[in-house]
Amino acid sequence: LEGLVSVVLDELSASSRHLPVCLGLSGASTARMKEALDDTADWPINGYLIASPYYIRPSQRGLVQHFNALADHASWPIVLYNIPYRTAVNLTNETLLALAEHPNIAGMKDCCADRAQSIDFLNRRPAGFRVLTGEDAQTFDALSDGADGAILLSAHLETDTFASIRTLLRQGKRDLALTAWQSVVGLTRLLFAEPSPAPAKHWLWRQRLIDSPEVRLPMVEVSEDLATWLDAEMERRAQLLLPA
């Protein structure tokens, strides 16, 4: 918990409290997740981002009871995190609709990787329930389909571009949004060519925004081949910014 406190305090300082901060929590035990909610109840955050219990693959009925129990217990609103390729269980749309009725469940980070499921939920979700895509390479499609925004690794590197894509789509300027998207879609693929966050850390380190590309085992730093590709893409983007 001490390490988590340090990370959160750093983030709160960096955001200067102008941006909402959601604390990510995960675990396979409802009881222990409640303890984590108690431990963080007085932290100066705005909400929680909570994924499904991993590894144990509970039923949909179990997922509803799990998240409702956490929402009843939490001091801050919860954003569901549906990422079945990491947790091994998918929150179905019927389950999501049931959970969306809880007043303390505010939205979802959608990484179901099934566009048909995502569109179906967007069309059926209750008013005020926010959907944020977390699939970097599918950002343009998700925003075009009606997602409210995104939580993206790639946006750490190209924040203004990703923000402009959302703004342009909301203004009905699809062609301009597509042009902006085409300028970053290759980057989204590079950043996930090897397990994240190693590629992004390499990029930020090369830009001297962080002190080291080091990651903790079992994660490892990027391969020499990917480092070469990342460095080349960084140089290409730097050249684009030079005056003609």
Which role does the model predict for each range below?
Residues 1, 5, 33, 67, ...:
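A general structural signal for well-ordered alpha-helical segments in protein cores
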Residues 1-90:
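Active-site beta->alpha loop and helix N-cap motifs at the rims of alpha/beta catalytic domains
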Residues 8, 40, 70, 108, ...:
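Conserved, mostly hydrophobic/aromatic
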Residues 11-19, 43-44, 74-76, 101-104, ...:
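Short helix-capping segments at alpha-helix termini
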Residues 32, 62, 117, 175-176, ...:
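An acidic, carboxylate-rich microenvironment
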Residues 52, 80, 88, 102, ...:
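Generic secondary-structure boundary/loop-capping signal
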Residues 72-73, 84-192:
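Catalytic alpha/beta core domains of metabolic enzymes, predominantly
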Residues 147, 151, 158-244:
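C-terminal alpha-helical cap/extension of soluble enzyme domains
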